[in-house]
Swiss-Prot record:
It comes from Polynucleobacter necessarius subsp. necessarius (strain STIR1). PANTHER family: GDP-MANNOSE MANNOSYL HYDROLASE, MUTT_NUDIX FAMILY PROTEIN. A motif (Nudix box) lies at residues 38-59. Its EC number is 3.6.1.-. This is RNA pyrophosphohydrolase. Accelerates the degradation of transcripts by removing pyrophosphate from the 5'-end of triphosphorylated RNA, leading to a more labile monophosphorylated state that can stimulate subsequent ribonuclease cleavage. The lineage of its organism: Bacteria, Pseudomonadati, Pseudomonadota, Betaproteobacteria, Burkholderiales. InterPro entries: Nudix_hydrolase, NUDIX_hydrolase-like_dom_sf, NUDIX_hydrolase_CS, NUDIX_hydrolase_dom, RppH.
């Protein structure tokens, strides 16, 4: 199901734990990591699709999560032609298909980590997972999705604690904040390693 511009409706899911860390899933047989996501089927609302995808990819049920917020509008990314040529998908007519348009949901896990089951379905999307900081560096995400991830995280950050939002305003964009924090921690650990010698 494509819209008039060639985008497939889709949902993206940012799942938080109690420490505001996010679920990060490793694609089966690949070295790329991503948030859960999936297509909206005919007749489904974005929320219904989100719950279905959450169950299919992560094994969670509606009672395991609380919806905190969602993006106001669709966020789009184009899939590069060379990537489409490598796929053997017959579901989407390549001549018309441009990419995905996504509504992103921010969820809080109210269940347990043990409720996460990557093999809930016969064909799992992920073969490993971990909790990572909200402002995760996106190098492990396939290149053409990175901008949409930055947009989604930036928009969904408004639902986080006031303290995190104030840091964002004081120190630039959320990604700038994370990268400066990450770089600062690397510098500190290098200097402490040197002083230990």
């Amino acid at each position: 199901m494509l819209d008039r511009e060639g985008y497939r409706p889709n949902v993206g899911i940012v799942l938080l734990n109690s420490r505001n860390e996010v679920f990060w899933g490793k694609r089966v047989g690949q070295h790329s990591w991503q948030f859960p996501q999936g297509g909206i089927q005919h007749g489904e609302s974005p929320e219904q699709a989100m719950y279905r995808e959450l169950h299919e990819e992560v094994g969670l049920l509606p009672e395991h999560v609380q919806i905190i917020g969602r993006t106001r509008d669709w966020l789009r990314y184009d899939v590069p032609e060379e990537y489409l040529r490598r796929q053997n998908s017959t579901r989407v007519h390549r001549a018309a298909y441009r990419g995905q348009k996504q509504i992103w949901f921010l969820l809080r896990l109210v269940g347990l980590d043990s409720d996460i089951q990557l093999r809930a379905f016969e064909h799992p999307e992920f073969d490993a997972w971990r909790w990572v900081p909200f402002w995760i560096q996106l190098d492990a995400v396939i290149g053409f999705k990175r901008e949409v991830y930055q947009l989604a995280l930036s928009e969904l950050a408004r639902y986080l604690s006031r303290g995190m939002r104030m840091q964002q305003l004081a120190w630039g964009t959320p990604l700038d904040l994370f990268q400066s924090f990450y770089a600062g921690n690397e510098d500190q650990s290098k200097s402490s390693e040197k002083s230990d010698k």
